[in-house]
């Protein structure tokens, strides 16, 4: 098969991280696979994919909002005559749907929905637009039951075009990584390291994690990995509350497996989440995960890690403190490690390939 994945960018994020594992696996099975991005701004995963032999095509505009993206997509599709065109994230979904109107060949168009919520769903006008956009895809994949349910309710549709395929990761990459010495991150070896890996976005709620630090002893240190528009807001909060000596901002990093191995606890405290691939990565690293009890994320963590209220930083702090109990820490860590084994990239990628093959036979 000839497969084109189109994604808004390759910034730090769950959908982007999935592609760094999914695409090389598909190529290893003998398929012709390329990735097209609308913008290479902050494309932390671009080099990783290129190093693994994946060709990355950047839209001519190098902008996620340019109308010319339609023609960049059409030109790439016709140039390689793809069998499958697979769009990820909203801007890629929109431009790909419009590009399809100019495509005169009956190839298959697939999209994956990666989140349970977004700002578009606050607008009745956007519902009509989204209905049109999603009507152009032969198959709509969701990364969890919660993601599919929320999308079906939004589109007011429930038909056989919907399918669920959970995200997956390379388990061994995280299991076998070597941790850093904490002092390499500017933290004392006997300090308790709480880590959050995510872009700084309102939905990810780094501010709530910083607030939880106010309820924790001074030996607890917080490390944020990622960047984004709201990073300065979190820094200002930490400065105002005299927390800067206890918080490290590492920015964008490519050594996520080693960083997760270095943490004592990993937190994912989102207001909403389609799946929670970072939680799975932390679990595969053998770390206990504390997450907000929201759809998508709770499905991954429940029964293994600890779930807390998404808007209660004091409850988050209590969850962190509960892991001072060595027996509980060991129990939660082991459960998390076992849970991660359900979500392998091999299982995920094979499910996508089987989906493509079924669609091409239709």
Q: How would you name each of these model-derived features?
A:
Residues 5-68, 155, 229-230:
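N-terminal strand-loop element at the rim of the active site
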Residues 13-24, 192-215, 229-236, 280, ...:
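A conserved mid-protein helix/loop that constitutes part of the nucleotide-sugar donor-binding site
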Residues 37, 288-291:
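Short hydrophobic beta-strand element within catalytic cores of glycosyltransferases
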Residues 64-68, 149-153, 159-161, 166-184:
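Acidic anion/phosphate-binding donor-loop and adjacent secondary structure
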Residues 87-95, 113:
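Short His-centered aromatic/hydrophobic patch
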Residues 252, 271:
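Aromatic "clamp/platform" in nucleotide-sugar-dependent glycosyltransferases that forms part
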Residues 291, 303-313, 322-327:
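Conserved acidic donor-binding segment of nucleotide-sugar-dependent glycosyltransferases
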Residues 328-342, 351-354:
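A short, well-ordered alpha-helix in the C-terminal region of glycosyltransferases
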């Amino acid at each position: 098969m000839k497969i084109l994945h189109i994604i808004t960018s390759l910034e730090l994020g769950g959908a982007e991280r999935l592609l760094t594992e999914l695409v090389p696996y598909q190529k290893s099975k003998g398929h012709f696979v390329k990735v097209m991005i609308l913008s290479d701004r902050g494309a932390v995963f671009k080099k990783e994919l290129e190093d693994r032999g994946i060709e990355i095509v950047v839209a001519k505009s190098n902008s996620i909002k340019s109308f010319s993206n339609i023609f960049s997509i059409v030109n790439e599709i016709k140039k390689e005559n793809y069998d499958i065109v697979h769009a990820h994230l909203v801007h890629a979904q929109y431009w790909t749907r419009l590009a399809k109107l100019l495509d005169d060949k009956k190839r298959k168009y697939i999209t994956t929905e990666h989140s349970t919520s977004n700002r578009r769903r606050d607008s009745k006008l956007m519902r009509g637009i989204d209905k049109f956009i999603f009507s152009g895809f032969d198959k709509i994949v969701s990364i969890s039951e919660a993601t599919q349910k929320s999308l079906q309710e939004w589109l007011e549709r429930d038909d056989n075009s919907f399918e669920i395929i959970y995200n997956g990761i390379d388990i061994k990459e995280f299991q076998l990584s070597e941790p850093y010495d904490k002092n390499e991150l500017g933290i004392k070896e006997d300090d308790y390291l709480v880590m959050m890996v995510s872009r700084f976005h309102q939905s990810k709620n780094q501010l709530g994690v910083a607030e939880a630090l106010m309820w924790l002893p001074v030996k607890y240190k917080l490390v944020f990995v990622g960047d984004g528009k709201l990073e300065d807001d979190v820094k200002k909060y930490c400065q105002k509350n005299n927390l800067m000596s206890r918080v490290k901002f590492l920015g964008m990093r490519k050594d996520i497996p080693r960083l997760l191995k270095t943490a004592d606890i990993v937190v994912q405290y989102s207001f909403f989440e389609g799946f929670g691939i970072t939680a799975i990565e932390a679990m595969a690293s053998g770390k206990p995960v504390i997450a907000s009890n929201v759809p998508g994320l709770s499905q991954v963590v429940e029964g293994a890690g600890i779930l807390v209220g998404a808007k209660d930083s004091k409850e988050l702090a209590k969850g962190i403190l509960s892991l001072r109990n060595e027996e509980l820490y060991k129990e939660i860590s082991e459960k998390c490690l076992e849970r991660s084994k359900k979500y392998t990239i091999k299982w995920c990628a094979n499910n996508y390939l089987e989906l493509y093959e079924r669609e091409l036979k239709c």
